[in-house]
Amino acid sequence: LQEIIVRIAGMQRQPVPEIKPRAAVIFCADNGVVAEGVTQCGQDVTATVTRNMGKGKSTMCLMAKSLGMDVYPVDIGVAETVDKNGVIDRKIRFGTENIADNPALPRAQAITAIETGIEMAEMCAAKGYRLICGGEMGIGNTTTSAAVAAVLTGEPVRSLTGRGAGLSSAGLQRKMQVIECAIANHAPDISDPIDVISK
């Protein structure tokens, strides 16, 4: 914790960092790989939680409120239409492709997603936030993030893949198999992080 505080103080160029006001920006999107049975619940949960965040009623929002933190949910790729009631609409597409069959999304859309993150950080800075936390919501995200981590670190998929939100042992085996096959089939270029993200 001390190391983090020192880094924040360095970024702010002051001996005692200011971390108020603070905001959490939660990027919400669906993953097509859910079709492979790699999660315990359905894709529709992403939209439900996104809507609840927009109303300030999700568990995350309640925890953030107790810390005096504002929450900005961003629909960057939820598989269904989410009303703009408290949700920032930056939808790039309605969910990604199923990485078991195809790359997750075109390179240009991966770049747009990164640019959206930059836009949200700039928005928060313009509003005067001193600390911005980024987060994600999307059923299947631990599958795609494990795939990205395996490629970028060179670590075995099996050492990076977990049960997510309570996957069974058989489901976990299926999840690892899907990730390993996706990496082998799409051959992401480790020297090009955007290629890794998009595949």
Regions found by a protein language model. Give the residues of each.
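N-terminal loops that bind phosphate or other acidic moieties
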Residues: L1-K199
